[in-house]
């Protein structure tokens, strides 16, 4: 017989809650074994309670919710886990926002900064921030900019390309030139600002940022984001 704690918990829900003033957001992923349990009211209430603990600043929700966790495990007969959490507090001028996609299968939190308070409250800025949450949910970037990409990740991409059949017997200068294009393509896959904009793929996210800067007369910076995908690493 498989022990309860060894059973795979890959179903569940991603939940996010914002504080009333919009300056704090908590997001959690709570897992269970079956989609059936994940859709029950008891499980959803438990996930919400965990998220509210994180929102309140509780650093170890697993310890704080120990009794409730034991209760939900005994109610469902499944291995329920509080898998991961994040908590954003707005720093400086700007906005934080969240988006839950596919009924709790994907969750995103983003923080975007600007220079002026009036920008932070403008419709153009609000739309940009919302669009960025949709972008991150749909396109799954790993970094904000190419500056954040570790050198070894870039080197790995180059190495894979160098060893591919298309470059066998080609002169080094041709290979090196081609590698620049390959690295740029890699950046457009994994870096948020380099990605094609999901609403208008002929533009990049950088183009959309610049348009908002022009509209608001302000400097806008994507500070950070977190993306949870249910059951993924």
Descriptions of predicted regions:
Residues 1-233:
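N-terminal assembly/interaction segments in proteins that build large macromolecular machines
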């Amino acid at each position: 017989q498989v022990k309860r704690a060894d059973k795979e918990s890959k179903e569940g829900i991603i939940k996010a809650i914002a504080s009333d003033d919009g300056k704090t957001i908590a997001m959690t992923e709570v897992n269970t074994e079956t989609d059936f349990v994940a859709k029950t009211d008891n499980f959803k209430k438990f996930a919400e309670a965990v998220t509210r603990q994180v929102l309140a600043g509780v650093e170890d929700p697993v310890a704080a919710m120990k009794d409730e966790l034991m209760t939900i495990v005994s109610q469902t007969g499944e291995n329920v886990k509080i898998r991961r959490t994040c908590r954003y507090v707005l720093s400086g001028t700007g906005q934080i926002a969240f988006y839950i996609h596919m009924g709790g299968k994907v969750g995103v939190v983003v923080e975007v900064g600007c220079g002026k308070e009036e920008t932070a409250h403008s419709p153009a800025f609000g739309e940009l921030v919302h669009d960025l949450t949709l972008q991150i949910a749909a396109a799954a970037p790993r970094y904000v900019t190419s500056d954040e990409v570790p050198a070894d990740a870039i080197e790995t991409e180059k190495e894979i390309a160098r060893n591919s059949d298309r470059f066998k017997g080609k002169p080094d200068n041709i290979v090196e030139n081609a590698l620049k294009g390959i690295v740029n393509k890699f950046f457009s896959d994994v870096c948020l600002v380099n990605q094609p904009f999901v609403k208008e793929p002929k533009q990049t996210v950088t183009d959309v940022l610049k348009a908002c800067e022009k509209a608001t007369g302000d400097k806008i910076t994507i500070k950070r984001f977190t993306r949870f995908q249910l059951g993924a690493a």
